[in-house]
Amino acid sequence: VLVLTPEAALEGGAERIVMGWSDTREATRAAHDALALARSGAEIQLVSVISRAADAVPGLDSKDDFATALDRLGYKVSVSERNATADNRGETLIGAAQDFGADLLVAGAFGHSQLYDFVIGAVTRDLLYKSPLPVLLSK
């Protein structure tokens, strides 16, 4: 799903992209889907949002491998990590995109029960309702 804000458009493709990264099928799918919207040689930042110690296990993150693959395709790639609490991960990712000057924010979309979303927060919901820039969500 590509969500465009009234004041933002992607005419000609995205030049600066922030991809929310986690070792999940949804995040990987979203990252691959975003390449269809990226301009040749676009700047891409892979951002991991760390909200608990288990999220930061060294050696278990594939974003470096994906960054290498993107580099080989001619993209200018960087990786970063942001710390967040469980209830502000979406806002943290939006902040990373704004700091990077991104014209597209990409993330995997997760579907959970309403109770689950209420208890831990809904990153997907935050991205849909709070992002001032275009968002690509893939599931």
Segments from the language model and where they lie:
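Intrinsically disordered or low-complexity boundary/linker segments at protein termini
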Residues: 1-41, 45, 130-139
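Redox- and metal-dependent alpha/beta enzyme cores, enriched for Fe-S-associated oxidoreductases
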Residues: 23-73, 80
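Gly/Ser-rich helix-loop-strand patches that form or flank binding pockets
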Residues: 1-10, 97-139
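Short beta->alpha junction loops
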Residues: 79-87
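Short, well-ordered secondary-structure micro-motifs
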Residues: 14-15, 30, 55-60, 90-92, ...
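Aromatic/hydrophobic pocket-lining residues that form π-stacking "cages" and hydrophobic walls in ligand
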Residues: 66, 93, 127
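Short beta-strands and strand-loop turn motifs
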Residues: 3-4, 45-50, 79, 106-109
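Short acidic active-site motifs
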Residues: 62, 88-94, 123
